[in-house]
Amino acid sequence: FPDELKSFFLVSESDGYAHIYHYDYDGNLLNQVTKGDFEVIGIDALDLKKKKIYFTSTEGSSTERHLYVAKFDGSSKKRLTPEPGQHSVSVSPDGKYYLDSYSNVSTPRQVEMWTTKGKMIEKMVDNQSVLEFIEKTAYAAKELFSFTASDGQKLDGYYIKPIDFDPGKSYP
């Protein structure tokens, strides 16, 4: 609770999804920062000078986690992590940089240092040896899919076909 802010941010599910709310110290709601059919995973950093909040959310896909930045009033929201996948980030105290550790179904863990203006500074871990091993080895990749359940809820999943998959053959 920074003294100069005179307010605080809270992640709450009061609208049915986990979203960020901005309150004054008397408990009065100033504004709802995020809205929509997605979940905010957590608040990563505040830039008090620029009045920006950095947060991780599932916006776009429930199977992914991305870093976003928005103004305290919720405007000017922008996704910062460019690659698809599950991102785990650490934002610098001044809000200028972030360390991004991510992977997805076709990319082993990558670790990169970025500016919050969108410039990659350094790829620290690329797992090139893992990528080379996958290319040389008989490997069945995961395939993502989604469907709508009987209650209308969208569900995501993946399947792995046999390496020698034959679409004309029947499988158990």
What are these regions (language model features)?
Residues 1-4, 38-49:
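Short coil-to-beta transitions that initiate beta-strands within beta-rich domains
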Residues 1-9, 167:
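Short intrinsically disordered, low-complexity coil segments enriched in acidic
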Residues 5-6, 50-51, 94-96:
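Short coil/turn segments that connect the beta-strands within blades of beta-propeller domains
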Residues 6-7, 13-32, 58-79, 103-125:
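Beta-propeller blade-edge and WD-like acidic-aromatic loop motif
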Residues 11, 42-46, 56, 77-166:
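Non-catalytic accessory segments flanking enzyme active sites
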Residues 170-172:
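Alpha/beta-hydrolase fold active-site loops
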